[in-house]
Amino acid sequence: AKDYQDNIYKGFMNALDDPYSCYYTADEYQPLMESTSGSYEGIGVVVSQNVQTKIITVVRPFEGCPGAEAGMLPGDILIEVAGNDVSGIDVSTVVSWIKGEGGTTVDIRVYRESEDKYYDFTVERRKIEVPTVAYEMLEDNIGYVQVTEFDEVTSDQYIAAVDDLKAQGMEGLIVDIRDNPGGLLSCVVDMLDYMLPE
């Protein structure tokens, strides 16, 4: 009966013919909220899967997070996670093995091609705040802020970045949102309110 009800609601939304309106079940809504919260419990490592080979590689360990602190590096190839061979396994499944309750640990084996060596890590999970803002001061006191996505944590990170650049004597600002997949409208509104208070 619940599936029938969900399908009715989905049908209503589809009938609107609006690309920005849709219905989510509780199971579909949970990962969506996690993806836009900007925080999760895990080890703070971005991984990517090659479509052809299915090899999963570390793209970027977040600075100051457990994965980086353990010694994981960009380019490391995942071999095993939590005792499971990851060969041919979908990346979303592997990520679900890596994530877990803060304070628990996960065993990860990687192959580092540049050294032709295998490394074993036992990494303690903790709450990770995803860094969605990077910034620097360019020549002529021009501040540069890159925003990679609009999550719950982004507006605070953006305001902190702009405040720091102002303290350094910023006279102009470039906000780079290229390749930003989007996210929360409320975050964008908060950022614009800060930039354009009137």
Residues of each region from the PLM?
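Cleft-lining beta-strand/loop regions that shape enzyme active-site pockets
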Residues: T57-R60, A68-L73, E80-D85, S92-E198
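Extended, small/polar residue-biased N-terminal targeting/export presequences
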Residues: A1-T57, T105-D107, Y111-T122, V130-Y135
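Residue-level recognition of conserved structural "scaffold" positions that shape functional pockets
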Residues: Q49-V51, L78, D190
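Generic hydrophobic, aliphatic-rich segments that mediate packing or membrane embedding
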Residues: E28, S39-E41, P74, D90, ...
